[in-house]
Amino acid sequence: MGSLEAERKTTGWAARDPSGVLSPYTYTLRETGPEDVFIKIIYCGICHTDIHQIKNDLGASNYPMVPGHEVVGEVVEVGSDVTKFKVGDCVGDGTIVGCCKTCRPCKADVEQYCNKKIWSYNDVYTDGKPTQGGFSGHMVVDQKFVVKIPDGMAPEQAAPLLCAGVTVYSPLTHFGLKEISGLRGGILGLGGVGHMGVKLAKAMGHHVTVISSSDKKKEEAIDHLGADAYLVSSDATQMQEAADSLDYIIDTVPVFHPLEPYLSLLKLDGKLILMGVINTPLQFISPMVMLGRKAITGSFIGSMKETEEMLDFCNEKGITSTIEVVKMDYINTAFERLEKNDVRYRFVVDVAGSKLDQET
């Protein structure tokens, strides 16, 4: 264990206003406590939620803001009470960096549903300092919210699993779908989360149908990701033929869309699981749910326990995310491309290999 300092400075890339443009920003990290891990960041994935935050789409953004919550790095120092990690470990940190540890969700190891959870960025830590994310040189994180990256897993591949991976893994396990081989599942939307949904559901032995508004991703879905079928939601004939065929649908679409067409695809007792962050009320008519005893539910990222399970599952099954690695000075272009769905399927920033204090 090295000597922990009360204050350290690091440089990240921050948004200053709702334009969402990021540029170098040097700031002071929070004080390192006895249960904290000091991490040198190596890679950080880019998530669509980062766009919502830097552009104040949800109306709660505070600036300057360093985004990034798919963080993989190396442990540089550990606090005196840290028991889970040692210097040199390759570790990850996701969306949450704090919780109350006393409420019902916390005691049930689903701390992501704690009403007092602390986000990895755009939040305030218990010491009053703003939290800043993974597009930076270093982070200080409570050991509870850090996971070990399994041996043999490439760190750049691990980064998207900490959000996109566990976001899909959590409902598949919570709703008992993981253990039932042969289920017929639908993945609505083939982006960063959706492509992980295909890979994870297939590894669980499910028959997977990708649902998209056009056929432009059909070859990719079937030939490269291993989906069993592809359904074009704008084709009325295809949708009618697929009625009552799916046990569940994982809806990853982050923009407003009608639910009725997808409810019609579900079998009796089927589940429509919402995952996209949408700031517009969704609509459906109640008979679409009542007449098939169908359920519309949601799921939010995953717990630390689920994250550890998911990483082990992916390592065992050889599941990786499909990524494009970029340097930090490309991040604004990467955000622009992500908004246009011009990425296959997740950007990962090579933080350690970037000059954080320089713009192009």
From Swiss-Prot:
Matching InterPro entries: ADH-like_C, ADH-like_N, ADH_Zn_CS, CAD-like, GroES-like_sf, NAD(P)-bd_dom_sf, PKS_ER
Cofactor(s) needed by this chain: Zn(2+)
Catalytic reactions on record: (E)-cinnamyl alcohol + NADP(+) = (E)-cinnamaldehyde + NADPH + H(+); (E)-coniferol + NADP(+) = (E)-coniferaldehyde + NADPH + H(+); (E)-sinapyl alcohol + NADP(+) = (E)-sinapaldehyde + NADPH + H(+); (E)-4-coumaroyl alcohol + NADP(+) = (E)-4-coumaraldehyde + NADPH + H(+)
Positions bound to NADP(+): 49, 167, 189-194, 212-217, 252, 276, 299-301
Cofactor binding notes: Binds 2 Zn(2+) ions per subunit.
One GO term (biological process): lignin biosynthetic process
Superkingdom classification of source: Eukaryota
Positions contributing to Zn(2+) 1 binding: C47, H69, E70, C163
Keywords, in A-Z order: Lignin biosynthesis, Metal-binding, NADP, Oxidoreductase, Zinc
TM segment ranges: none
Statement: the UniProt record of this protein carries the keyword Zinc: yes
One Pfam family this sequence matches: ADH_zinc_N
Leading EC class: oxidoreductase
Family label: Belongs to the zinc-containing alcohol dehydrogenase family.
Oligomer status and interactors: Homodimer.
Function: Involved in lignin biosynthesis. Catalyzes the final step specific for the production of lignin monomers. Catalyzes the NADPH-dependent reduction of coniferaldehyde, 5-hydroxyconiferaldehyde, sinapaldehyde, 4-coumaraldehyde and caffeyl aldehyde to their respective alcohols.
Protein name stated in the entry: Probable cinnamyl alcohol dehydrogenase 1
Organism the protein comes from: Aralia cordata
